[in-house]
Amino acid sequence: MESLVNPHVLQITPYKPGKPVEDLQREFNLKKIVKLASNENMLPIPERVRNAIDEELSQVHLYPDSDNHYLRQRLAEYNGLQLDNVIVGAGSVEIIHMLIRTFLKSGEKVLSSEKTFSLYKITTTEIAGESAYVEAPMSQDLCFDLQAIACKIDPQTKIIFITNPNNPTGTFIHAQPIRDFIERVPSDKIVVLDNAYQEYIDNPDDYVTGLDEIRQKKNVVVLRTFSKVYGLAGLRVGYAMAKPEIIAILNRVKAPFNVTRISQRAALASLESEDYKNESVRMNRANKAKLFSQLQSLGLRVIPSQTNFLLFFPKMDVAE
């Protein structure tokens, strides 16, 4: 069978998502499980979103709006951009795939950091082979080392992924270093700011959203998601913002009807549910501080986090 397969696919180490609670209960014969593996929002979605989903159920025999027009329009307003600055995907994972498939030419490379979101490497390997993905080392405090990344940029570099805050370390990069880094990147490269956990940042004034860079027509793409603070992980809605020229090219490869009717309606309703978003952030901050303290009291090394999860180092090999 392997002789029939694209050799790039054979190089992939598959992504391992967190298992559903039902699978874990069955596998380990447990009744109660607190699932923290997938960085999900444990707060039930607000009534406004539930009502929007219920209303849309009667229309699921019809295809969704393939252009995602109303959601894109609202996202543009929400972020102070124009309609042609926004594209919507079935989770930001779909857009990551679109970006690499669209812009990575033969012989070019994707650059990011070690210990970051594994889908960058998996997708690059699928499309261009394992050798097309380049990792820079992290700093000692498990942050993206922008200087190390800058040193890896060469003529073959095409796309640079910066995850801020980072998954899985929870660390973040202050605003000025990112601005300085973007200024250093040659104009024939694309910088992707994956801001999936942006809402959890403690100090928004010290954070680069990427929106100013988009307005300045730089080759910057910003990724956002409804899976975290908005609690819509099961509906798969993400979006990207960039200058119109980049969005227009991405629309050439976007699958038709890629975001369901229910997902579009739920996302629109979520954008009108600021109280829910604020409560999600408040609850996360309080519980994260409590868990951080408790883990430290066990003598464990815990990394300060600007996300909805914590990275800690157990005193034993987890494989055991």
Name each model-derived stretch.
Residues 2-93, 98:
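N-terminal small-domain helix-loop-helix segment of the aminotransferase-like
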Residues 138, 294-320:
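Conserved PLP-binding catalytic core of the aspartate aminotransferase-like
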Residues 219-296, 300-303:
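PLP-dependent aminotransferase class I/II
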